[in-house]
From Swiss-Prot:
Zn(2+) 2 binds at D161. Its main location: secreted. It comes from Aspergillus terreus (strain NIH 2624 / FGSC A1156). Keywords: Glycoprotein, Hydrolase, Metal-binding, Protease, Secreted, Signal, Zinc. Glycans are attached at N92. This is Probable carboxypeptidase ATEG_02905. Residues 1-18 form the signal peptide. InterPro entries: ArgE/DapE_CS, Bact_exopeptidase_dim_dom, Peptidase_M20, Peptidase_M20_dimer, Peptidase_M20A. The lineage of its organism: Eukaryota, Fungi, Dikarya, Ascomycota, Pezizomycotina. It is found in: Secreted. Pfam families: M20_dimer, Peptidase_M20. Binds 2 Zn(2+) ions per subunit.
Length: 433
């Protein structure tokens, strides 16, 4: 679905021959050979029991319920962190609560922390790390469960993104450890993934992520519709800024409209994903398709009867190829060409100075559908150090639920998806051991 801003610009673009933004199909690289875990027995149990009874009778589903019932909007994750930490301690894990400051370095109003855990008596440097995040986007949506045909649909904020992954990772680890108490597993549940990745960055820069790396594999949990993800697009953000001179709207020649100055640059930037790279556009790739541009917010002026002295727009770019620095150069040239070199219109990258290129991930475990995704994750926020033996550290991205409902008013997941994710995480752990 196009944004209202892109539709507005597209209307203007009909006069200059701009192309629309076609919706690219999501690339599926290989079909699944997994049969899942929801067979006749599970279907029969669900069909004959009330939803609440099924959930209450399952430690796994009860853990997921209790976690979703805790509001943990980014910046306010403490209660969820305490819940996860206390549960793991009660199940014979050593738990480290790693403090995470706010992005500007000041501690937020409510203390928050990452939860890092490993089996008591085992090494604090596990070979296999399962990780996801406990923060959610706003607003909080209460937990609910209802029978739907032969399944149970669980609704609530975080039920998909990413408390479904958290619950499945915890119980996959418990299942593996019950069979093999010496399994070299670790769990990491971070804060702030939804608003900047500060939690993972703090872990990445800490002694808990040593060099050489102890990790043989890192398994990231996000809603992937139970597919194993071979990679996701990169990310670049910036603000497009224009400055002008205020004046009475009855005498516009006495001022200079920042909004009018901004529009040609916006139109050009909005099309950069559709323009071939050889013609000055942003690059595409066979794996990830087109680079996409979203102008998410515009603001300018103070009143309709005042020539606006300032205007700006926030832009998010999902990179299909290349590096953030290369994309910044393309954006700068596009703005310069669109404005005739007007120095009062420029892209400001200072607020989003990092960015990252496309992230290629491992898919060497059989039994999964393989796909790519367009959303961002904490994958680039975890620096992977070289191992002492020179072997590569495998990175997997997998989880239950659909990203298409993850941030919406109807975020929901099914019991069948959660149970299949439990099996999927076990399979990934066993392959990495």
């Amino acid at each position: 679905m196009k944004s209202a801003i892109s539709l507005l610009l597209a209307s203007a673009a009909t006069y200059v021959g701009a192309s629309p933004h076609p919706e690219p199909p999501q690339l599926v690289l290989s079909p699944s050979t997994s049969t899942g875990v929801h067979g006749d027995e599970a279907t029969s149990a669900i069909a004959s029991s009330a939803a609440d009874d099924v959930i209450s009778d399952s430690p796994f589903l009860s853990f997921h319920r209790d976690l979703v019932q805790i509001s943990s909007i980014s910046g306010h994750e403490r209660k969820a962190g305490d819940f996860v930490a206390e549960f793991l301690q009660a199940h014979n894990f050593t738990v480290v609560k790693q403090p995470v400051p706010s992005k500007d370095g000041r501690q937020p109003d409510e203390d928050r922390f990452n939860v890092f855990a490993y089996p008591s008596g085992a090494s604090a440097a596990p070979k296999i790390l399962l990780t996801s995040h406990i923060d959610t986007v706003p607003p909080f949506i209460p937990y609910s469960a209802a029978r739907v045909d032969n399944d149970i649909r669980i609704s609530g904020r975080g039920s998909v993104d990413a408390k479904g992954s958290v619950a499945a990772q915890v119980f996959a680890a418990l299942d593996i450890l019950e069979r093999d108490p010496s399994a070299p597993l670790g769990l990491l549940f971070v804060v702030d993934e939804e608003v900047g990745g500060t939690g993972m960055k703090v872990f990445s820069d800490s002694s808990l992520n040593p060099s050489p790396s102890p990790f043989r594999a890192v398994i990231f949990g996000e809603p992937t519709d139970l597919a194993l993800v071979s990679g996701h697009k990169g990310m670049l953000g910036f603000e497009l800024v224009a400055t002008g001179q205020a004046a009475h709207s009855g005498y516009p020649w006495l001022g200079h409209s920042a909004v009018s100055a901004l529009l040609p640059a916006l139109l050009r930037v909005d099309r950069l994903g559709d323009i071939p790279a050889q013609e000055g556009g942003l690059p595409s790739s066979p794996k990830y398709g087109r680079t996409t541009v979203n102008i998410g917010r515009m603001e300018g002026g103070v009143a309709a009867n005042v020539v606006p002295a300032s205007a700006h727009a926030n832009v998010a770019v999902r990179l299909a190829a290349g590096t953030p620095d290369e994309a910044r150069d393309i954006v700068r040239r596009a703005v310069r060409d669109a404005t005739g070199g007007d120095e009062n219109v420029y892209p400001d990258f200072s607020e989003w100075s990092e960015g990252y290129p496309p992230q290629d991930l491992d898919t060497d475990v059989d039994g999964f559908e393989v796909t790519t995704v367009n959303y961002g994750t904490d994958v680039p926020n975890l620096r992977i150090h070289e191992r002492a033996d020179g072997a590569p550290v495998r990175r997997y991205l997998y989880g239950p639920g659909s990203i298409h409902v993850a941030h919406g008013d109807h975020e929901a997941i099914t019991v069948a998806q959660l149970e299949e994710a439990l099996q999927g995480y076990r399979k990934l752990i066993e392959a990495a051991m």
